[in-house]
């Protein structure tokens, strides 16, 4: 696309030898669709927003992790106190003898699964490494680039150790209630979610959990679940032949008329209009 915004290496890296650096987004503002001359890891710390990656929408919040390739198109909209960090790197500049393809999904043709989650323990460990990496990537001493690459290797191994699929928190995990709740919500796309039953199972206060969730994500639990379902509906409308009523059921709405009302309120167009517009742009 001739008018596609492309982020350039020269605007982010200090020289042609630097392989890795950190770009803070405190907060991340609305950002138009773009690609890059480099790759990046996106780690979300707080708040929420709509991340559209290769035309697929994701409602993102704390703990979301993305592996972005240079050619991927993505944008940020509907942001609310969204705080994230981009760890950007040039694969061709990496010199460390590490099996990067085993560590980074999509690295130079490796199998690509872009969206993962980190629990609180993984986030804490990753944050420590990223802080060191940011310090070294801003350094000017002769070994700064080598130290930054070593820390990048440590980071991608830490992420691989702690990441998990969005709907599959390991049963042995020692993660927090908030991590368990977000995983439970991801498993409730098609069926009702009962917060009282969740709190009874986890032996926690419903009121306190609601407060914690809102403080960390900037949304209520119901708002988050509704928007995750709408994102899934947008994807199905664009990429499946299912009827609107069938998509409504698959996204947790038993009444297709109510689904259409909610979808229109959240996106500004009806499900049929969304499908028509998406098919036109393909």
Swiss-Prot record:
Residues 179-277 form the HTH araC/xylS-type domain. The record marks 246 as: Interaction with sigma-70. SMART domains: HTH_ARAC. The keyword Transcription regulation applies. It holds the Pfam family HTH_18. Keywords: Activator, Cytoplasm, DNA-binding, Repeat, Rhamnose metabolism, Transcription, Transcription regulation. One of its GO terms (molecular function) is DNA-binding transcription factor activity. Residues 196-217, 244-267 bind DNA. One of its GO terms (biological process) is rhamnose metabolic process. PANTHER family: ARAC-FAMILY TRANSCRIPTIONAL REGULATOR, HTH-TYPE TRANSCRIPTIONAL ACTIVATOR RHAR. This is HTH-type transcriptional activator RhaR. It comes from Salmonella heidelberg (strain SL476). The lineage of its organism: Bacteria, Pseudomonadati, Pseudomonadota, Gammaproteobacteria, Enterobacterales. The gene is rhaR.
